Amino acid sequence: MAGIKDIAEAAGVSLSTVSNVINGKRNVGKKTREKVLQLIEEMDYVPNEAGKLLKTKENHTILFVFSDFDRSFYLEVLKGVNDYLKNKDYDLLICTQRSCEKYMRNNMSSGCIVLDAALRDNAILRCANENYPIVALDRTCASPYVRSVIVDNYPAMCEMMQDIIDRGYRRFAFLSGVETSLDNMERYRGFSDTIEKNGLHFHQKNYFVGDYREESGYTVGKILSLAENLPDALICANDNMAIGAIKAFRENNIRVPEDIAVTGFDDIERAQEIGLTTITVPDYERGYLAALYLVEALNGKDVAKTFQISPKVKMRKTVLVKKTKIRSKIVK
């Protein structure tokens, strides 16, 4: 099993830099932080040194379990968590799914914030109890000891889809993320219900399963580029996949939005840079609220079981103002 020294050597950084990343401190550059987090995941690092410290500070340490599907999104949430905790006398420990139960169940942290679609509900339910509250982002769990901060995905997706249909778009493809995640299910439900409401038909051959990563969007973009007839629009369950699909389309001389419109969800920094039509999720605020919820639960306050955040549609340049014609065949 890798140690902190192995991570530092592989990343080409100092031991203190790795320690700062593990503990959620903000004095590390974005690229360096992402590189260290990737190595932590790949090398299955369990922070033993941190674990020894936690045994003496168990009532002042918050665990943050993250997924590496989208680090841009994760970092904004983490900033919100850290900003709330830094003045509350709590330390922050970051870990991945592989080692999280160890820190949840061995008195090595006082509470946990979970942001990992791959972590199963039963793992959360095994650990949550009266003395160990958990706040889950983007999911709900049947336990009085698990609070949730979720995004109201459905109405936002309905609003965006109705706007796109009103602009003349009729034939759609949908690229899902992790199918079992609450976010993905609600985004797809908003997509399909709006299509049905408008009397349109969605062909299941145009339903693709991704994993929220840019690479899966790129793969689907390449597949669609080989099709004889493009759909009018590709609706993606997050921005990373939309960005990957756009890259594949451009490599195959398919114009966005003239030949195919593309949309995302989250409004990460890169989405703003390329003018991606998407739905803005206030990630910083989600992290801040999750930390607030957890600390209040630890202090014995009566906290609502679920807090719902409303996102906003951002129509940008990857969707035409008015769809006037359908491209019938791709010319290579």
Where are these regions (language model features)?
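Alpha-helical structural signal in soluble globular domains
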Residues: L39, G80-Y84, R126, E186-N198, ...
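N-terminal helix-turn-helix DNA-binding module of bacterial transcription factors
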Residues: M1-E58, F73, R189, K323, ...
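Hinge/beta->alpha junction and helix N-cap segments in small-molecule ligand-binding domains
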Residues: F66-E76, T96-C100, V149-E159, L175-V220, ...
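Alpha-helical recognition/docking segments in bacterial nutrient-uptake
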Residues: A2, K57-Q162, D166, L226
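Periplasmic-binding protein-like
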Residues: L63, S109-L115, A173-L175, Y207, ...
